[in-house]
C-alpha cells in the first residue's frame, strides 16, 4: 500500500493505556519508520501522535528557534491540502523563499524594509490561491479533537484524537502532512512565534528556566531556549526552515 510504504512519521496510535506497556505493539516499516500501538477496545476514540526526534538542540547556532517555528508551520497544508491552484501558488511560494534569503542578506534597513513589503505583496497573492487552515479543517471534519503540537530540546510531536473508524483517513492526511508540507503564511506565523517569545519574557518561570539551562549547559546546545534568540527570529530564512525539515523529518528519525 503506497501510504504505508511512504509514510514518514512516528505514529503512536493509542486510545488509552490501562497499564503502562500492557498490550504495546511495536514494529518498524521498511523505510525505517517506527510504529507503536496501544489498544483499548473499551474506548471509541483514538489518540494519534507523530513524534520526530529533533528539537531545539538541533537548531543551527546562527538560526536558533527553527525547530519550534517549523512546528508552527507544519499546520499549513501541503501541495494538495490547502491550495486552490498549486500551479499558480508554487512559483509565488518559491519567490517568497528567495525574498527571505535576500532580506536576510541585506544590511541596509531601508532596503530590508522594501524587501519586506515585497514579501507582504507576494504573501497576499499566495493567499488568493490557498486556504492555509484547510489541514486543521479536515481534521475537525472527521471528528478530530485537540489538534496540537509541542517542541522540546530533543523531540517535536504532533497529536490529536479522532474516532476509531476514521483511522485510515487520519493516516492519509497525516502522511501527506509529513511528506509534502508547504510552509504557508510564514510571515504572519513569525509574528505569532515572536509574540510567544515576548510572553515568555514576561513569565518568571520561563525566564528562570532559560537562565538555569544557559548556566547548567553553558557551551552546549542544551543551553539554548526552545523559542530561539530574538535576533534570529527577526531575520528569518524560509530556506533554512526547509533545510531543517529535509535534514530531520525523515522516516528513520
Where are these regions (language model features)?
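Boundary at the C-terminal end of the N-terminal hydrophobic targeting segment
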Residues: 19-21
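Bacterial N-terminal signal peptides that target proteins for export
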Residues: 1-8
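Short, linear, compositionally biased motifs with a strong N-terminal bias
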Residues: 10-13
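Charge-rich, well-structured scaffold segments of protease-associated domains
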Residues: 28, 86-253
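Envelope-exposed proteins and targeting segments
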Residues: 23-25, 31-33, 44-50, 63, ...
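Active/ligand-binding-proximal structured segments within catalytic/core domains
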Residues: 32, 41-92
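Short, low-complexity Ser/Thr-rich regulatory SLiMs
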Residues: 39-41, 151
